[in-house]
Amino acid sequence: MDIVTPILTPFTKEGKIDVEKLKAHAKFLIDNGIDLLFVNGTTGLGPALSKEEKLTTLKTIYDVTNKVIFQVGSLNINDVIDLVKASKDFDIVGIASYPPFYFPRLPEKFLLKYFTTIANYSPHSLYIYNYPLATGYDISAKIVYQMKDLITGLKDTNQDLSHSLEYKILMPNLKVYNGSDSLVFYSLTSLDGSVTAASNYLPHVMKKMKEHITSGQVSKAIELQKLINKALDISRKYGQLSAIYYLVKEFLGYDVGYPRGPIFPLEEDEVKALLSEIQPVKKEIERAVS
């Protein structure tokens, strides 16, 4: 029952990775109940990072913890291989990658070859990152089954829990995480855990939910899921990936810098509106976890 944070990547106003803020955020998360950090995921703006930046995030976070799944996906296969090779210097939990995106009607054999190439170079366990909405390609359970001897786990960012369960039913030993914030409770109770972007600013809520589930207080855990959904609905109105940066400061009390285009920082009036709208939910959350 793992709570996995797809950790955001803090940037300066000039668009450089703020390594000190990244290190501090990683430490806070691990110290406050998060089990693993998913580095260079969607929330970390991984697809918009250079090869060098992806390695910088790994090096920075590794100074704090080795509880890391290192996402290396790219359309440049040479960059992917270089990152996988570089990971040999780090004692981490695993390597992950989304499939090649953009190119339509990609033959299944190309997809299999992509992940096989990573597995052949990787000294670590391999996790597949399935995000059909973003990549345009669904790595179904039947496709994953063909790679079952190569991989350890899978992150399925999908609003359909039954889709995630298909992997677990077909491959019981595969570690399966759902990546939807609205399904954290169901992922913790039905799968191996949840990769939840909201845990960047609500780690205490995720920790409390896990405690409720473990102690059999299911109704209390469901109430926390409802509060997560409220926060999620508000953040989406302003652009969820950008809003997370401001919500970390609001809920946790420290600065994590800015996002970077094409995920642009919010305008000042948007920040004020976001923080104003989140206040009632924040109070509900404080009461629920106290």
UniProtKB/Swiss-Prot annotation:
Name the positions where substrate binds: 42-43, 129-131, 155-157
What catalytic reaction does the record list?
2-dehydro-3-deoxy-6-phospho-D-gluconate = D-glyceraldehyde 3-phosphate + pyruvate; 2-dehydro-3-deoxy-6-phospho-D-galactonate = D-glyceraldehyde 3-phosphate + pyruvate
Where do the catalytic residues lie? 155
Looking up Pfam families in the UniProt record yields: DHDPS
The residue ranges crossing the membrane are: none
Task: State which Enzyme Commission number(s) the record gives.
Answer: 4.1.2.55
Known SMART domains for this protein?
Answer: DHDPS
Site label Proton shuttle, positions: 129
Per annotation, the relation between temperature and activity is: Optimum temperature is around 90 degrees Celsius. Extremely thermostable.
Q: Which UniProt keywords apply?
A: Carbohydrate metabolism, Lyase, Schiff base
Name the Gene3D superfamilies on file.
Aldolase class I
Judged by the first EC level, this protein's enzyme class is lyase
UniProt note: pH dependence: Optimum pH is 5.5.
Per the entry, what this protein does is: Involved in the degradation of glucose and galactose via the Entner-Doudoroff pathway. Catalyzes the reversible cleavage of 2-keto-3-deoxy-6-phosphogluconate (KDPG) and 2-keto-3-deoxygluconate (KDG) forming pyruvate and glyceraldehyde 3-phosphate or glyceraldehyde, respectively. It is also able to catalyze the reversible cleavage of 2-keto-3-deoxy-6-phosphogalactonate (KDPGal) and 2-keto-3-deoxygalactonate (KDGal).
Q: How does it assemble?
A: Homotetramer; dimer of dimers.
Family affiliation: Belongs to the DapA family. KDPG aldolase subfamily.
State what protein this is by name. Answer: 2-dehydro-3-deoxy-phosphogluconate/2-dehydro-3-deoxy-6-phosphogalactonate aldolase
**Per the UniProt entry, what species is this protein from, by scientific name?**
Sulfurisphaera tokodaii (strain DSM 16993 / JCM 10545 / NBRC 100140 / 7) (Sulfolobus tokodaii)
